[in-house]
């Protein structure tokens, strides 16, 4: 090509293993990228049976109808960068190599899956699942300057895209087509990024900004800072989960040290179709006490602008929400279970069905609980204490009506003793707020 790209079809002689209506192209992709970091993928169908690994400077351009498909039964992920590092047991050294300037534009990136898997069953880092927190189709970790644009992800069994330890990124014009878990899953030590125009159907969080995360869902823990999310459309359909997660926390390493996984300077605007923005700590389900002493995290300077949310039903279809439990059945468009300092709402339109769900709110602040008594199992973290301060708002609409005072639609949650527990139950506090 004129720009010096290699055409992957020039390596078709390597793709000799037949599969379905085509052939396995994994080796052809790898050889082409070794010869030239700039690769062109024309319209066609390319089956992949092992991970494609990108080095610094990799630049892939695919036609919009080019289909790159990870075949059924492959345990490992479809594509990743070379210098991935696992930070789940300790901080990644500053001297660890970072890949630089990786770009992928165009194409349909798919898996031959029809259900949620991940967590070692699919989307693994390698056959040994040596980085257990990897559960995805695309993985980028330890990268400076990442660009993903005009991509469609189809039928991904784990996350569609998982990134962490990234400095400087643009992720634009991404479609999720029948994806069974999270769409864009961002983990810690990720800074200076722009996310624009994400849409589609996912069956878990459309976007997860998880500075803190579970050990089976992240290898990178730390701050998320200086991000803009502009343009999100959450599609409906059976099993659609129309939510965005924003999760800080205090992550404990094995040696007893901790990581402050805070979120700071986050601007979210032009979102349509979301039901809930989850800003609470959630650790893995547990009996008696959480498996790790994770601390409540902090969010500083977050804004929501031009948001249209439909929260007429709870996004978490748990019995206490559906049955309107007067203590634990509260749910909201904005659910806060972190320490928040500086939060602004501007032109936010929310639908609530207070007649069916009197415990539905614009915002709740405090802990959540779903306790399964017969199993002694807690799904959330009812021991959380948190404070929200510095809230400002303008042009808030509830069910189409402009609301001058949002206090009737905001609730501080205080559980008291809701069941026998060795841990004290928590409460949320709102202070220092103004219009």
Predicted stretch roles:
Residues 1-435:
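Extracellular/periplasmic carbohydrate-active domains that bind, remodel
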